[in-house]
């Protein structure tokens, strides 16, 4: 991601943030290429943040047609029906993001994310997936891992006032300050498939309840053939039945996953804007950190619940 020096125009535009993270980090940002799929409220916040930060390019992939329901959860889509009739979410968001920072190349890609070949992902440094099934997350993550270069992979899922971020940086090297020294560090990340298949019983008792709840909801949607977020309160009895089966299969108490938490996740499919802003901000910060190579990255799950206002990082792998 290193390249030529910043132009005079870039230096002037990004002057304030260059003072924070340095010209080298800004140069790496300006040469980076980010793919974003599934643009709902949280992902829209993320896109705004990285475009304002000055990444080189953002490619948007979301072929859903814009509807009233869609624009209610996405501030990049203005509530003007005449402006979005017949247009996709990616097309409308692309136009809005260009206005935020004309120096960032924002484009769209059409197609089904799950059917794109491995070579498609080679042109990107970062891949961010929102609003996707468990199977799609696994498949795209595996394709990114099969590339000759390391591609930073993220998933984000916000349901009501709760959210989850997953991170896979494969083998990642970075620097951090330790007293007066700059220390080189390295982290090894598990894949999405590895991270969501960790046995529950050996996990620390303090592990975020949202981790387990998200696994139940994802599996329910997959087995029922639902799209992400296509749950309602009427599904709760079957969701609770699946929870019971998963807890028994993992030899843990059903108290691992409070019923009230699952009820919140299935009954509120509209993203809570303040939660979107916080989770999208954290995700943007992490991507900027990884592109710049400065600072310790999040490993490998982040959870936020607006009900208690707490953010929790969980490092989960088979090496527990």
Swiss-Prot record:
GO biological process: protein sumoylation
Cell location: Nucleus
Main location: nucleus
Modification N-acetylmethionine, positions: 1
Pathway: Protein modification; protein sumoylation
Keywords: Acetylation, Ligase, Nucleus, Ubl conjugation pathway
Single GO MF descriptor: SUMO activating enzyme activity
One annotated Gene Ontology cellular component of this protein: nucleus
Keyword Transferase: no
A Pfam family this chain is assigned to: ThiF
Its biological purpose: The dimeric enzyme acts as an E1 ligase for SUMO1 and SUMO2. It mediates ATP-dependent activation of SUMO proteins and formation of a thioester with a conserved cysteine residue on SAE2. Functionally redundant with its paralog SAE1A.
Subunit structure: Heterodimer of SAE1A or SAE1B and SAE2. The complex binds SUMO proteins via SAE2.
Family indicated by similarity: Belongs to the ubiquitin-activating E1 family.
Protein name: SUMO-activating enzyme subunit 1B-1
Encoding gene, per UniProt annotation: SAE1B-1
